[in-house]
Structure formats: C-alpha cells, structure tokens
C-alpha cells in the first residue's frame, strides 16, 4: 500500500512546486514591469512617452450617436408601430387589473397561488397583497404588475425562440453569446438613452429598457435546458421517426421546462429591479413613487414604496419557483 501511494504523492508535490514556480515567475515579471515603468517615468520627460488618451484617434461616441440618428430617421415607422403595439398590450393588462375589485383580484391571487405553489405561498401572497392594499398602493402596484407582465411577455416571446435556435446551432450560440454578455454587463442606466430616443418618454420606453435588461436569462436558460436533454432520448426520438418539430415540442421542450421556468423567474426579478430606473423616463407605478420620494427626500414614502416592491417580488418569486419545481417533478416522471 505504501509503495503504491508514494509515487502519486511525489507527483502531486512536484506539480504543486511547479505551479508555485509559475506564479512566482509571473508575479516577479509584473513587479519588474512596474519598477521599470516607475523608473522610466521618473527620469524621462512626459513628452518622451505621451499618454494613450492625449489625442484619442477613436471617436467611438460620435459614431454611435450617428448610428442612432440614422436608425431614428430611417426606421421611425417601425419604432412607432412597436410603440403602438406595446402601449396597447400594456394598457390592456393594466385596465384588466384595475377593472377588477380589489377583493376579487386578491381572492384570485390566493386561489392560483394555492393551486400552483401550495397553501403556505397562498397565505403569504394573500397577506402581502392585503398589506399593499392597506398601504394605499394597490393601483400603483397594478400599474407596476402591468409593466412587468408586458416586459416579461416580450422577453419570453423573443428569448425562447432565440434560445431554441442557439441550442440547435453552435454558430448561432457563439454569435449571440457576446451580445448577451454585453446586455447583462452594461449598466442599466445606459439602456434608458436609446429607449428615450426611439420611443420617447412614458411607460413604453420603460418597458423596452426593461426588456433589454431582463431578456438574456430567458435566452441562456432555454438554450441550456435544451442542450442538457439526454442524447439517448433525442436519438430514440429520431429512431422512432420523429420529425425535428415533433422532437422539439414533445421531447426537448418538456424536458427543458424546469430550466425555462428558471429563466422566467430570473426575467421577472430583473424586470422588478428596473422599475425604479424606468421611473426616470416617466414610467409609472411603484418606481415613480420611489423616484418622487427620492426627489423630496421623503424617507417614509420611499420606504413604503420600496417595501411594496419587495413584497411583489417575493410573491412572484415564490410562485414561479414552485412552477419550476412542478416542471422538474413532471420531467423526472417522464
């Protein structure tokens, strides 16, 4: 036993020493470069080594602005059509929510929370929505829900098909991956600028900025869910003569449902995180209440509106998480 275990131990120790030596080499090289740079800058005038940004030759901001102006001039009809459709969907959802009596809608929320997520989530959802009503923020809450619902519908309508295409083609996957990385890492404030330029002020640009920020998880998790479907099940479907369409809708999408539901959950949470930023471009709802409290330095008003947003997020998170778990149990039964 001892003779067999010694060689692997020696090999591990040798690899560890080699790894430490590499780290020491790179750390020493970095330190030497810093030292040489400091000595060089101390003994030579600045004119000898002009800074990179002394006279920047790349005016990227100008070209981006020119591109935006070109899009506005040449595609104004398309942007107007998108604005009209989005406004109609948003207003339809908001009017439907506000048309119902508060107690009726509260009962419906509790009923469906019980059906989809169980008794505990139903009790919590009912208590949270009742608390929101007692704070006098019911109508603003419904406006926020309408904005979130519209953004999530658009995000899923775009994200799921793109995720399916990315799962079926490595070339498409490699193409959209850097785009999704940029969409997720770009500061959310930046999305407000093109939203205002293309769609003006109000709820519609708020929805569009939210879609840009919240759509990537829908694409990524749909792609991931389909790619994680076992290969033997796909091959079995081909063996029994299933077409690609049948294989997608009867095998791959049902098995990818837990991952897709996780994408919906993440999209909803990211949409909620945008409601306050969307208020900066005149979007309504609870975000505007927080923004107004910030402008008036009204701590109580901001706390109440912020607490309401948190409660809405918790209710939606619990329900959508339960849907994902139900989908996981359904796929395991398959």
What are the language-model segments listed below?
Residues 208-212, 216, 230, 244-278, ...:
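Transmembrane alpha-helices
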Residues 197, 226, 271-312, 324-334:
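Glycine-rich helix-loop "coupling/hinge" segments at transmembrane-helix boundaries
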Residues 80, 84, 88-91, 95, ...:
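Short amphipathic alpha-helical coupling elements at transmembrane boundaries
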Residues 31, 107-112, 126-130, 149, ...:
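Generic alpha-helical transmembrane segments of integral inner-membrane proteins
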Residues 132, 147-150, 154-167, 177-214:
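Generic hydrophobic transmembrane alpha-helix motif, especially the helices
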Residues 186, 198-199, 211-215, 222-226, ...:
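Hydrophobic/aromatic residues within the transmembrane alpha-helices of Major Facilitator Superfamily
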Residues 1-146, 327-334:
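N-terminal, non-cleaved signal-anchor transmembrane helix
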Residues 121-122, 225-233, 244, 286:
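Transmembrane helix boundary and interhelical loop/hinge segments in multi-pass membrane proteins
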């Amino acid at each position: 036993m001892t003779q067999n275990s010694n060689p692997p131990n020696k090999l591990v120790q040798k690899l560890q020493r080699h790894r430490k030596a590499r780290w020491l080499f790179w750390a020493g090289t970095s330190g030497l470069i810093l030292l040489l740079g400091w000595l060089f800058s101390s003994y030579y005038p600045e004119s000898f080594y002009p800074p990179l940004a002394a006279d920047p030759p790349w005016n990227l901001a100008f070209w981006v602005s020119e591109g935006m102006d070109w899009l506005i001039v040449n595609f104004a009809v398309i942007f107007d059509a998108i604005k009209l459709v989005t406004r109609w969907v948003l207003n339809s959802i908001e009017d439907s929510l506000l048309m119902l009596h508060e107690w009726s809608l509260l009962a419906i929320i509790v009923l469906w929370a019980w059906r989809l997520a169980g008794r505990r989530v139903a009790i919590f959802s009912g208590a949270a929505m009742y608390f929101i009503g007692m704070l006098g923020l019911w109508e603003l809450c419904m406006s926020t829900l309408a904005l979130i619902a519209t953004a999530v519908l658009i995000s899923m309508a775009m994200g799921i098909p793109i995720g399916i295409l990315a799962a079926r083609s490595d070339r498409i996957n490699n193409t959209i991956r850097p785009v999704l990385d940029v969409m997720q890492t770009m500061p959310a404030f930046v999305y407000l600028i093109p939203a205002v330029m293309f769609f003006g002020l109000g709820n519609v640009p708020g929805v569009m900025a939210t879609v840009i920020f919240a759509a990537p998880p829908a694409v990524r998790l749909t792609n991931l869910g389909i790619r994680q479907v076992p290969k033997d099940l796909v091959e079995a479907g081909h063996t029994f003569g299933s077409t690609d369409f049948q294989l997608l809708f009867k095998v791959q999408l049902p098995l990818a449902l837990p991952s897709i539901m996780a994408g919906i959950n993440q999209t909803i949470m990211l949409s909620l995180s945008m409601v306050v930023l969307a208020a900066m471009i005149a979007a309504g709802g609870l975000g505007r209440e927080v923004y107004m409290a910030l402008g008036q330095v009204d701590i109580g008003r901001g706390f109440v509106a912020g607490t309401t947003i948190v409660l809405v997020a918790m209710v939606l998170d619990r329900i959508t998480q339960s849907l994902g778990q139900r989908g996981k149990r359904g796929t395991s039964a398959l």
